[in-house]
């Protein structure tokens, strides 16, 4: 079979076909209201020499050499970067993608400040001539800016006139040069207009707004008493923010740094899209948020220093058992080691006789992008955060740590670049920006021009996401981790058994070791147990990265696939995890303006303001300080009674059992410490944000599901986090609000399958327990602790007690989010897709006086099967027939629609059977096997049409993944290259990422690691694609439904938050939200989704041929129709027949979400 190297090449000026063999962009919409983005077909090119292909420019991803070029440019190493640039030019002459690289090179020379204009001009001319290209408007803008430099003014003004003359001679427009707001300030624009005698009236008012030309700019005056970025009111004394009394220096130092904004004159550029006007507090909080993001890393080091000095002042000269002080001792040594490493890198770069393949020449330019201070602080913060993640309670893989460290350095570098770019933005005038916000037409035009400008300035001027190659990330991370391991020491104490005294010894805080996982030897970094104890001891965590925290202001609205959320960190709208194809689709959909509604919806989720529930926080502090285990809160110390070593035993098995038990207890203890550290993180964040209003920026997974970008404390987390969080904006309960609070509390006790009246009565009957819980949460009956979600229940008890005792509950201001959950939401979508009336009734799409319980319905069918088998003499059926409850089948029913495998379902049922009285442990596996088959059989009988749709989706996926474009087959390319791609109703393109990526061996300072090469040319995994497609498709539907509901609520000024298929709002707005979410569901499914999907597949994969082996049909029939051909035209099977369900019935179903 002919094998070819497939080089993906995305042309900016030509339409090419996609990797899946598809035309990339449609010239017309498939449908009237949504636009599927199609894929690229590979640009087939003969394999070039090993050196040559390194320098082929590829827009779809950045090669290691391209990233190295950028790193050298940003480091000011213009000699090496020019050498690399010339190499690119030699292999890509005439290709316009060279222009952004040339522009970046010119821009960095200019922005360094010290340059000769003649050198800049000659450099630009030389590079452009070698590349056989003409400069674009950005090239001319940069050169014009250089000519305006005060040190070059005598020579510069004639050059300016010549540049503009040349640009006009090439039929260019001056406005195209001036519109590069990242290059010119308004004053520079005005100076150019004056020099060229361009009348103001040549520009439209909208263009003048975007150029930054205001009346004050024209007159040349600045308003007295006002800051350039806003009015004098910003300078006025702001009200003090109430602080929380605490031992930690972390918050005090942070608040100290923030308070400087009250008294000092600080220029804070105002973001062109994000700032809401009319509230001084918003402006102040924006300043605090930006300061937090910009300076928190180095502020952490200051906190560590403060704590360390405090310990020394107390006269304790030993190694201190205090997190901050310990970190500072590491930080000081680590910073020095980074300085020495950077010095070695600089020396090596000057020594031309050394081996050019030396690793320092490869990773050095990247390491130098950050200061040694930041490198040291980030290294400690990143390793500490991973160490406290419960997933790594037995240690973290070296590859995970190296990747995390390297990516954290890259993110910080991107953050610095964003801060730098902000200084050059033209939207610095708050008054002018306010005019844009007050004129919707001008604002829309401004956003459009910004989008065009971003495209015009190109990706090299704005470093892309994950642009550092994986090999570089690993090498940089390895350097940092090796340096940390050499300095990270911790003091441990032990009792001297001979003297009874205390022994102290300094040991490594982290150990590099190896463990076996699935038969493979894996490098691990294991923290010392004393380090875990230290982290979990106090509420003191000065190592939280600002990019992991909630925000003090409304997050930056999403305006493109790569621009939104935090202000000084860049993350994509969709969490890509190296899925390059998803980037391709997402980027083009964003550029085409097709994601505007999705941007609006994700931004709306971020606009919801939150606060900490102070009453619940106080309860948690009491529990935490007690050090005892309570519900899900881990204890301070885990007591593990280790049996004595059987040294006198003659049975070797006794010693094996003892060692096994020892490992189990050690793992238990380490896991408990890790969980306490994780809980400590959450509590620390809550403490820091007491008395604050804050927000959660959101992003999506590849299926479109929304998640907060913030880590640890957010509403998608556990019961404790959800209980701690409430809406910062309160609303009166109104006539029905108290009843909804009662329904909410009953749901938290697991009484969610009763009618609303019964749920309300449950709370009324236990009202004295509610009062007792609110008054004496830890000293009373603790009735709240018996709830399924106890901490949320306690928060609800506080709210209900206060509302009832207020005397006027309708006027009581409520902050608690009321949760309305779908009934096995995946099955709801399947029932609507298939028009399944019986299925619809089971999942509350059909109106009823009481909610249906699908889990009980399945359990009843299973019991019927078992009774029948028992009557036939089956022993297992006879034992199980009276023991199968809804709780036994619930996990399998919930996950069946999301693709749970038989093995996964059997494990779920095994765990339930183990708790049944009389069940012998040795028989669990056999009984679980038997029962799993019966549950699957029951589900198929109850949801026939849902399974028919699942089968159709899997069959289509199987055909797609075994298909290729006809021209590929002719050329002998028969690899399985085609993934499944579809488009949601909100125009989000979804590409399934399951491919057979090859591993690449990377040698680092610490050890050899293996990383996946995320390559578009990797073959797909047909089985994984097929099994994952049905659940992924349903996930994309429930995400679309959530966003449609979000948009409707936003239009009605209703606070809306969501955890997938659980929708939250104020108690007074529950009825209205329920009405809107029903309308959104009907609207979604009125679009004939399955027919649309089939049409999209037929258009997307038009002209494809599929392997005959992939088609489940009679061989004789295929042979008669196609002869002996191995590949035949791709045809999709007909859709399953749809039932007679009237979707409008959903509008009448009050238990649809409840």
UniProtKB/Swiss-Prot annotation:
Catalytic activities: RNA(n) + a ribonucleoside 5'-triphosphate = RNA(n+1) + diphosphate
Family matches, as PROSITE patterns: RNA_POL_PHAGE_1, RNA_POL_PHAGE_2
One GO CC term on file: cytosol
Compartment(s) where it occurs, according to its Swiss-Prot or TrEMBL record: Mitochondrion
Pfam families xrefs: RNA_pol, RPOL_N
First-tier enzyme category under EC: transferase
Record's signal peptide: none
Biological process annotations from GO: mitochondrial transcription; transcription initiation at mitochondrial promoter
Region (Disordered): 221-243
Active site per the UniProt annotation: 821, 890, 1061
Keywords for this protein: DNA-directed RNA polymerase, Mitochondrion, Nucleotidyltransferase, Transcription, Transferase, Transit peptide
Feature: transit peptide: 1-30
EC numbers on record: 2.7.7.6
Biological function: DNA-dependent RNA polymerase catalyzes the transcription of DNA into RNA using the four ribonucleoside triphosphates as substrates. Combines in the mitochondrion with mitochondrial transcription factor mtf1 as a holoenzyme to recognize and initiate transcription at the core mitochondrial promoters.
Family label: Belongs to the phage and mitochondrial RNA polymerase family.
Protein name, UniProt field: DNA-directed RNA polymerase, mitochondrial
Record lineage: Eukaryota, Fungi, Dikarya, Ascomycota, Taphrinomycotina
């Amino acid at each position: 079979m002919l094998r070819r190297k497939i080089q993906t090449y995305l042309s900016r000026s030509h339409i090419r076909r996609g990797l899946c063999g598809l035309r990339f962009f449609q010239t017309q919409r498939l449908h009237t209201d949504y636009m599927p983005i199609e894929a690229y077909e590979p640009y087939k090119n003969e394999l070039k020499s090993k050196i040559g292909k390194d320098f082929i420019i590829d827009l779809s991803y950045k090669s290691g050499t391209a990233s190295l070029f950028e790193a050298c440019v940003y480091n000011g190493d213009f000699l090496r970067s020019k050498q690399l640039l010339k190499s690119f030019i030699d292999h890509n002459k005439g290709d316009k993608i060279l222009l952004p690289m040339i522009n970046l090179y010119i821009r960095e020379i200019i922005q360094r400040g010290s340059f000769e204009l003649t050198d800049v001009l000659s450099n630009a001319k030389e590079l452009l001539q070698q590349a056989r290209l003409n400069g674009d408007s950005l090239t001319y803008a940069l050169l014009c800016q250089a000519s305006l430099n005060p040190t070059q003014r005598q020579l510069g003004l004639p050059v300016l006139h010549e540049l503009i003359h040349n640009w006009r001679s090439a039929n260019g427009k001056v406005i195209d040069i001036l519109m590069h707001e990242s290059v010119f300030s308004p004053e520079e624009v005005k100076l150019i207009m004056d020099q060229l005698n361009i009348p103001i009236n040549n520009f439209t008012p909208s263009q003048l707004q975007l150029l930054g030309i205001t009346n004050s700019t024209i007159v040349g005056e600045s308003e007295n008493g006002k800051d350039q970025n806003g009015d004098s009111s910003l300078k006025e004394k702001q009200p003090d923010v109430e602080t929380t009394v605490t031992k930690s220096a972390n918050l005090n130092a942070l608040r100290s740094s923030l308070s400087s904004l009250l008294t000092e004159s600080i220029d804070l550029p105002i973001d062109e899209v994000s700032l809401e006007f009319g509230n001084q507090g918003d402006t102040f909080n924006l300043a605090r948020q930006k300061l937090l993001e910009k300076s928190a890393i180095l502020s952490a080091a200051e906190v560590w220093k403060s704590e360390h000095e405090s310990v020394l002042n107390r006269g304790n000269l030993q190694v201190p058992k205090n997190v901050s002080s310990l970190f500072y001792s590491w930080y000081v040594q680590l910073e020095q080691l980074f300085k020495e490493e950077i010095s070695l890198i600089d020396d090596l770069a000057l020594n031309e006789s050394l081996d050019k393949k030396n690793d320092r020449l490869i990773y050095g330019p990247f390491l130098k992008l950050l200061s040694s201070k930041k490198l040291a602080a980030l290294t400690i913060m990143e390793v500490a955060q991973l160490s406290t993640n419960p997933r790594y309670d037995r240690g973290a893989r070296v590859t995970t740590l190296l990747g995390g460290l390297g990516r954290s350095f890259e993110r910080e570098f991107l953050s610095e670049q964003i801060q730098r770019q902000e200084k050059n933005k033209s939207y610095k005038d708050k008054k002018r920006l306010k005019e844009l916000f007050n004129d919707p037409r001008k604002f829309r035009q401004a956003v459009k021009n910004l989008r065009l400008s971003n495209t015009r300035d190109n990706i090299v001027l704005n470093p892309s996401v994950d642009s550092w190659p994986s090999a570089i990330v690993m090498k940089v991370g390895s350097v940092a981790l090796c340096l940390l391991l050499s300095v990270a020491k911790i003091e441990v104490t032990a009792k001297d058994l001979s003297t009874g005294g205390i022994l102290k010894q300094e040991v490594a805080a982290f150990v590099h070791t190896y463990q076996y996982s699935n038969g493979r030897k894996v490098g691990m970094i294991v923290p010392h147990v004393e380090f875990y104890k230290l982290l979990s001891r106090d509420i003191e965590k000065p190592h939280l990265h600002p990019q992991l925290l909630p925000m003090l202001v409304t997050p930056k609205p999403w305006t493109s696939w790569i621009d939104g959320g935090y202000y000084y960190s860049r993350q994509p709208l969709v969490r890509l995890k190296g899925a390059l194809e998803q980037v391709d689709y997402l980027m083009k959909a964003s550029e085409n303006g097709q994601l505007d509604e999705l941007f609006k919806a994700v931004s709306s989720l971020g606009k919801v303001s939150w606060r900490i529930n102070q009453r619940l926080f106080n309860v948690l502090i009491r529990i935490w300080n007690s050090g005892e285990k309570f519900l899900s809160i881990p204890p301070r110390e885990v007591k593990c009674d280790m049996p004595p070593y059987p040294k006198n035993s003659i049975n070797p098995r006794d010693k094996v059992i003892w060692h096994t038990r020892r490992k189990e207890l050690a793992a238990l203890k380490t896991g408990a410490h890790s969980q306490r550290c994780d809980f400590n993180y959450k509590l620390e964040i809550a403490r820091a944000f007491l008395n604050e209003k804050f927000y959660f920026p959101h992003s999506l997974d590849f299926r479109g599901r929304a998640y907060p970008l913030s880590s640890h404390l957010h509403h998608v987390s556990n019961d404790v986090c959800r209980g701690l969080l409430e809406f910062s904006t309160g609303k009166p309960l109104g006539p029905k609000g108290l009843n909804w609070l009662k329904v909410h509390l009953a749901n938290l006790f697991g009484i969610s399958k009763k009618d609303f009246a019964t749920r309300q009565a449950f709370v009324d009957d236990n009202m004295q327990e509610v009062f007792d819980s609110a008054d004496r949460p830890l000293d009373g009956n603790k009735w709240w602790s018996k709830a399924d979600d106890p901490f949320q229940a306690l928060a609800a008890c506080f709210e209900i007690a206060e509302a009832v005792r207020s005397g006027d509950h309708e006027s009581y201001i409520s902050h608690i989010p009321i949760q309305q959950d779908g009934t096995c939401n995946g099955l709801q979508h399947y029932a609507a897709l298939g028009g399944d009336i019986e299925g619809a009734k089971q999942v509350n799409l059909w109106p009823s006086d009481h909610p249906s319980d699908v889990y009980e319905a399945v359990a009843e069918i299973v019991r019927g099967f078992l009774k029948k088998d028992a009557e036939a003499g089956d022993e297992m059926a006879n034992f199980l027939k009276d023991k199968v409850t809804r709780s036994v089948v619930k996990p399998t029913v919930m996950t069946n629609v999301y693709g749970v495998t038989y093995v996964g379902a059997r494990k779920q049922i095994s765990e339930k059977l183990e708790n049944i009285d009389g069940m012998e442990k040795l028989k669990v596996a056999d009984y679980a096997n038997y029962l799993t088959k019966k549950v699957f059989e029951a589900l198929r009988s109850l949801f026939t049409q849902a399974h028919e749709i699942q089968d159709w989706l899997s069959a289509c996926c199987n055909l797609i993944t075994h298909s290729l474009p006809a021209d590929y087959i002719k050329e002998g390319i028969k690899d399985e290259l085609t993934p499944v791609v579809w488009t949601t109703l909100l125009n989000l393109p979804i590409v399934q990422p399951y491919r057979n990526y090859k591993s690449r061996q990377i040698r680092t300072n610490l050890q050899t690691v293996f990383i996946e090469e995320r390559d578009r040319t990797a073959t797909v995994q047909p089985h994984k694609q097929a099994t994952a497609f049905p659940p992924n498709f349903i996930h994309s539907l429930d995400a679309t439904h959530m966003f449609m509901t979000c948009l409707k609520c936003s239009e009605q000024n209703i606070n809306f938050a969501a955890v997938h298929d659980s929708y939250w709002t104020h108690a007074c707005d529950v009825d209205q939200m329920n009405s809107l979410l029903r309308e959104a569901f009907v609207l979604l499914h009125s679009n004939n989704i399955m027919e649309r999907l089939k049409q999209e597949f037929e258009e997307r994969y038009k002209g494809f041929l599929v392997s005959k082996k992939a088609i489940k049909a009679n061989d004789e029939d295929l042979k008669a129709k196609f002869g002996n051909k191995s590949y035949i035209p791709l045809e999709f099977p007909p859709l399953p027949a749809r039932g007679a369900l009237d979707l409008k019935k959903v509008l009448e179903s009050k238990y649809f979400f409840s």
